[in-house]
Regions:
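Long, His/Glu/Asp-enriched segments that create or flank divalent metal/ion-associated functional microenvironments
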Residues: 1-195
């Protein structure tokens, strides 16, 4: 697989470029797919996992790697952590707004105060976000919800290691997670408990 960088994308700031590459390329989507195909290939045991789409798993992993990439960037670590938290808060807010729109029937005027709190005040911007959320329900939930599920799996894996007096490492968890996916989080949690 290859990752194409459009010339216009290279003009973006280094943080956005670095985190986008982490999300889309290495260690995000591209790495996850290459890992699956190179370690398991497609066989009778996993053909359904190969054919089916598990957006919470794949977007959860990609967002996890994106947010993790902030800690590997050069520069002021406090500032990088602030940027990471800002990204996470934005995604969380978009999930909340998505739920408010599709569950509670929230309107543009209902969501504008939430967006204003994070600096989005221009009516055209608020309308664009509202329109996107209306037309693409659940989009941000697969990212942020998948990420939160991944963090639950990570904590479950860590506790399992501790209960069995095994040394926990992020590397071991990452390998376990990638070897057991793509799949539902229910199945991954069951695999952790049965490992």
């Amino acid at each position: 697989q290859s990752l194409a960088c459009k010339e216009s994308g290279l003009k973006k700031d280094a943080v956005e470029l670095f985190t986008t590459l982490a999300h889309e390329g290495f260690p995000g989507h591209m790495y996850q797919n290459v890992y699956f195909l190179s370690t398991q290939g497609v066989n009778k045991k996993n053909i359904l996992r190969y054919c089916m789409d598990f957006p919470g798993y794949s977007e959860g992993w990609a967002l996890y790697t994106e947010l993790l990439s902030f800690s590997y960037m050069d520069g002021d670590k406090t500032y990088m952590e602030l940027l990471r938290l800002s990204r996470e808060i934005q995604l969380c807010l978009l999930c909340i707004l998505d739920i408010r729109i599709h569950n509670d029937g929230a309107t543009v005027s209902d969501i504008s105060p939430y967006l204003a709190r994070i600096g989005i005040k221009e009516p055209v911007d608020v309308e664009n976000i509202y329109s996107y959320l209306v037309n693409e329900p659940g989009t941000y939930l697969k990212y942020y919800g998948g990420y939160l599920e991944l963090l639950e799996c990570k904590e479950l894996y860590r506790k399992k290691c501790m209960s069995e007096d095994k040394t926990y490492s992020d590397l071991n968890f990452h390998e376990f997670f990638l070897e057991h996916g793509p799949d539902t989080y229910i199945n991954i949690k069951a695999a952790i408990e049965n490992s």
